[in-house]
């Protein structure tokens, strides 16, 4: 079974702890798949912490993916993470992903 299949399997079974190692894989596609999978579990603080750390990564594609994953989060914690990072972010694509995530979160809290 390949890494992408493992990510899909662990995500389907809710085995979040098994997803974390894939976030730092040498294969970017594996990293992106793991980040996307973590987005399904944003109600867990360890997931929020991991996604928050990825927003500091040097890779803009990974930062965009983390912002997109955070869009499924509920509550003010995700908003504060995104707002804080948005103030520091220099890449326009990542900024847009963060704004989209914020809009998505806010639309559910009306």
Positions of the model-derived regions?
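Conserved hydrophobic register position within alpha-solenoid helical repeats
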Residues: 3-6, 34, 66, 98
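Alpha-helix N-cap/helix-start positions at coil->helix boundaries
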Residues: 13, 28-29, 45, 60-61, ...
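Charged low-complexity stretches with an acidic bias
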Residues: 58-84, 90-93
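N-terminal intrinsically disordered, low-complexity tails enriched in polar/charged
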Residues: 1-13
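Amphipathic alpha-helical scaffolding segments comprising HEAT/armadillo-like alpha-solenoid repeats
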Residues: 10-23, 43-56, 75-87, 108-110
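Short, contiguous, helix-prone interaction/anchoring segments in small proteins
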Residues: 29-40
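Eukaryotic acidic, Ser/Thr-rich intrinsically disordered low-complexity regions
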Residues: 87, 94-110
């Amino acid at each position: 079974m390949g890494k992408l299949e493992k990510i899909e399997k662990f995500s389907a079974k809710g085995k979040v702890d098994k997803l974390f190692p894939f976030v730092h894989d040498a294969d970017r596609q594996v990293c992106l798949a793991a980040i996307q999978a973590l987005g399904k579990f944003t109600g867990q603080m360890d997931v929020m912490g991991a996604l928050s750390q990825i927003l500091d990564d040097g890779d803009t594609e990974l930062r965009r993916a983390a912002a997109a994953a955070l869009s499924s989060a509920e509550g003010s914690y995700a908003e504060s993470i995104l707002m804080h990072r948005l103030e520091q972010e220099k890449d326009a694509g990542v900024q847009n992903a963060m704004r989209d995530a914020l809009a998505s979160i806010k639309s559910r809290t009306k």
